[in-house]
Amino acid sequence: MQKLIIYGGKPLRGSINISGAKNAVLPIMAASILTDKLHITNVPKLTDVSTMKGLLRSHGADIETIEHQDEFELIINTRNINNFTADYDIVRKMRASIWVLGPLLTKYGKAKVSLPGGCAIGARQVDLHIAVLKAMGAMIEIEGGYINASSKGRLKGTHFIFDKVSVGATINAILAAVLAEGETLLFNCGREPEIVDLCNCLIKMGADIIGVGTSEITIKGKDALNKVSYKVLSDRIEAGTYMLAAAITKGDVKICGIDYHIIENLALKLIETGIKVVPIDNGVQVIYEGKLNAVNLETNPYPGFATDLQAQFMSLMTLSSGVSMITENIFENRFMHVPELCRMGADILVRGNKAIVRGVEMLKGAEVMASDLRASVSLILAGLSTNSKTVLHRIYHLDRGFQDLEKKLSNCGADIKRV
């Protein structure tokens, strides 16, 4: 099994180009079911993208992949969809597989989707997905680990209030509503940039969506959607991770190809710690200026601080001057990186959904193991900060969400290699 070997202590200097957003491209790929053909550009080279390609092909889609140096183009032809079951063998690998449920159901009136897998960071139930589809007239049962869904005729527009903000359920509801009969009003929706990107793609396809980027979305269903070409936005989580890498290594890095406003909440937190963050053309520059203050942090739905950056930010706080409190409000069990950071000398105490982080002067290299995607990269950041050797095991998580990570870090001076 592959592992990463990191020799830390080298400040990162240079520039890093950000790839397409994983959490945007996956629902956009699922949206191809709603039309006959969809051309997607700026597609990141990730195993989750390969998994979604495999899932769509299992439904009968024909996919042409055009490879460029830093991205893929996908041309997805879905005219011959003939299988409406998403099997466990594929779905277990990735939670985003649940996003074929809404498109299959709204276009073909039936879908059978295995309960999903992905990172082991809590229950992340599908109850809200099922509830909103039932409100649109779907008949749904869960049998043998599968969601069996059907409808008599088209789904019907509805008014639905999400009990809590759910990115995944918001996406499935939008994907179903764009071809439903009548008007759908969704309340307490996710506002994430990736949801906005999906909506922009659907609007380009001919969907009628009002309220994009707000918590209240109105969708007037169409009979059909059009073939289009669409460029996926850049990945704010990847950008934020490299911003934190620059800070933890006491470096100076330009993060290129990202809109500042979608990473502003992280930028403001970094400024609060004493890190210099400067907006530049098409990106942001992060500069360590000799101090790192402890700050408190709470994860919340967008525009709050992203849960997908919590582990990386915690790595930074392990080296801060003082004590920080990190509160995880999105997922339970998302502190699985803490024992591994403590193996490296971090002083962290977990109490429920809160972690108390007491800054130490330096972390020490160690053999550590990744438990999920974001935890794995937090351990890389920790390893980069040390003056010794760190070995990271179970790195297959990384390839689900970070394209060319070792190359991008090495180009900025990191000593990191995969063996």
UniProtKB/Swiss-Prot annotation:
Broad enzyme group: transferase
Transmembrane stretches, start-end: none
Domain of life (superkingdom): Bacteria
Chain positions recorded as phosphoenolpyruvate binding sites: K22, N23
Keywords, comma-separated and alphabetical: Cell cycle, Cell division, Cell shape, Cell wall biogenesis/degradation, Cytoplasm, Peptidoglycan synthesis, Pyruvate, Transferase
Annotated residues for binding of UDP-N-acetyl-alpha-D-glucosamine: R95, K164, V165, S166, V167, D308, I330
Catalytic activity: phosphoenolpyruvate + UDP-N-acetyl-alpha-D-glucosamine = UDP-N-acetyl-3-O-(1-carboxyvinyl)-alpha-D-glucosamine + phosphate
Any one of the GO BP annotations: cell division
Role noted for this protein: Cell wall formation. Adds enolpyruvyl to UDP-N-acetylglucosamine.
Protein name (Swiss-Prot/TrEMBL): UDP-N-acetylglucosamine 1-carboxyvinyltransferase
Originating organism: Rickettsia canadensis (strain McKiel)
